[in-house]
Amino acid sequence: MIDKEVAELRRRYRQDRSNITKIHGCYVNVHGELVSAFTLSMGLLPEGEQEKYLELLKKGISGRMGKTLSDLSFSTAQVADSDEHRLLMRLRDSGLEDEEAVQTLYEKIAGSLHLADNYLILLAADRYDVPFRSRDGFRQEEGSEQQFSYILCSICPVKETKPVLRYDSAEGKFHERGTDWVAAAPEVGFLFPAFDDRATNLYGALYYTKNTDNSYEEFVSAVFNLQPPMPAGTQRETFREVLTDALEDECSVNVVQNVHTALRELVLTHKETRAEEPLAVTRQEVGAVLEHCGVSEPKMAAFNVKYDEAFGGGSEVPPQNLLGAAQLEYRTPDVVIRVNPDR
């Protein structure tokens, strides 16, 4: 998916746009035990509560692709016949009315997702009549020809508040208010199926993590039977290690500056052109910069091997995830290179 498609779905999470009729939830304690489960009718909730639930669901697909959001892709074999894909399809096709499937998902999540706090699993099913867009990008409601049916899951830590003094307007005095347990912004979330090219893609899902340094591998394995992408927060450090370990004594200030200049130019050009497709670089593109810097063939061969080991063969990495430091730092066995990226 691309950011524009995610934003189109996020705009639905308002009372006047959403087709969500029920909210399904499960409260899980820190020991992974299911404390309680519930189903709420949106139409019977006070307006304020409806807004709060929609806000928490919306935040489960917040951020940008390549940072807090990433695509998960199922294999053809999984889509054809696998327990994990079959469960997601049961949830989606039933609009979460299949109670056994919902319970199974709760148990999978509780058994694989370990947070520091208790947490609340929120589930919702939505049906989106996708408006037709003409070639010039204008939206035409009457031209809608397809419906996108999907489920959304937001998993929110439940935190204990501190005692505070609150104002009692009847008495005109302040009194202590005890502790409460409140649902915080989602830590993890997903949407299934994917909304690729503004259409249903049963081979994909959208995955969200608030913490860009943690991909919650056990959770992804339990629910999707997939390997999660490398966390965005880990990619820069991994790239630094690949360069320094592979190039060794050839990892000079000039090489470091040239690599980062090339990556930054790609990011700036992508922003200026306002391209919709996510920006990504391959090993070959980074390798071309290293060759231009005069890196020797043996070191290039070592770089190719270490890059593929770290990121995967044929992988594409958002270049902005490889940048971001105010001061670049590369360590070799004999020296630490610190470079101002703007110089």
Question: Predicted regions: what is each one?
Answer:
Residues D342-R343:
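Hydrophobic, glycine-enriched assembly/anchoring segments
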Residues D3-N19, H24-R331, R338:
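Long, hydrophobic alpha/beta structural blocks
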